Design a protein with these regions (language model features):
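Catalytic domains of carbohydrate-active enzymes that cleave complex glycans
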Residues: 2-71, 75-76, 152-153, 168-266
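Active-site clefts of carbohydrate-active enzymes
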Residues: 62, 110-142, 159
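Short, solvent-exposed loop/turn segments at secondary-structure junctions
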Residues: 11-13, 59, 94, 123-124, ...
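Glycoside hydrolase catalytic-domain groove-lining segments
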Residues: 76-124
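Conserved beta-strand positions
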Residues: 8-9, 22-23, 89, 118, ...
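Alpha-helical scaffolding within the catalytic cores
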Residues: 38, 63-77, 94-108, 139-142
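Glycine-rich, aromatic-lined ligand/substrate-binding cores of catalytic
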Residues: 139, 151-163
Length: 266
């Protein structure tokens, strides 16, 4: 199950009438890119306005875009145009290099309806924001702060209930081998804890909600004072400065929210 959130786009209401499809998860070579092209063409014969989302953390091997797959990373839109409209890059690749964002965005064609989203999957690891077990609360919450600051129009998470298969719903929950603890799992079967069949939310998904609400505060502030002022507020309060520089407790976030309330309540 994918969890995608359209929290930045001023035209997000239009997505209610569109279909978004992902044809291939993290393609690595030109053969896999050709699969995306073929599936995209086939989908358009049935749904002409479908929007194709492609996740990737490197450029395609075997291409002539650049000397290495890392250098080709920013050039991916040139390979997949017009077969992808939403280019979704891994935060792991960006690391702490926020300058890479400009390189990625520079290759996009907004006039063709192209967008840039980000995602986390396995990486990045501590101290950068992610949703693994064992990370602090603000580290979970900062995934949203990071995505907003970088300027994408959406965010994708690869899975929300991807624990190991079990024969009965009440079986002990086991995370998938080879993945960081909690990766791809944000809620649990209710039967594990009681007779209820209602899913049980994790603390992490509650923190994700808090991060999404923080985005709404920042968007409100932006609507009144402009995005640059909202970015300055995020940094001035110490809530979030970068992927390895953010608040370790919720005090600065409360200050940020309080300032938004004070200046926007009238």
């Amino acid at each position: 199950m994918y969890m995608a959130h359209l929290f930045f786009s001023s035209k997000r209401d239009t997505y209610h009438h569109l279909t978004i499809c992902s044809c291939f998860f993290q393609p690595l070579n030109m053969e896999q890119y050709e699969v995306i092209r073929n599936i995209s063409n086939e989908l358009r014969t049935y749904t002409p306005d479908v929007r194709i989302l492609t996740t990737y953390y490197a450029g395609p091997s075997g291409s002539e875009l650049a000397p290495s797959t890392f250098e080709a990373f920013a050039k991916v839109p040139n390979v997949l145009r017009p077969h992808t409209q939403i280019f979704c890059t891994s935060e792991w690749v960006l690391g702490t290099r926020e300058d890479l964002v400009k390189d990625i965005i520079a290759e996009l064609r907004p006039d063709l309806g192209e967008e840039w989203w980000t995602y986390v999957c396995m990486g990045p690891s501590d101290p950068q924001p992610n949703w693994h077990l064992g990370m602090r609360g603000t580290q979970h919450r900062a995934v949203m702060w990071r995505a907003w600051k970088e300027g994408g129009t959406g965010f994708l998470y690869w899975g929300t209930n991807c624990y190991e298969k079990a024969m009965i719903p009440s079986a002990e929950i086991c995370f998938r081998r080879g993945l960081p603890p909690g990766d791809g799992v944000l809620f649990y079967p209710g039967e594990v804890f009681s007779s209820s069949k209602e899913p049980v939310a994790s603390l992490r998904i509650e923190r994700i909600l808090s991060g999404m609400q923080d985005i709404e505060y920042l968007n409100l502030y932006s609507s009144k004072h402009g995005r640059e002022e909202a970015l300055a507020l995020l940094e001035k309060t110490g809530a979030y400065l970068g992927p390895d520089r953010y608040a370790h407790d919720h005090g600065p976030v409360d200050v940020m929210r309080g300032e938004v309330y004070r200046t926007c309540r009238s």
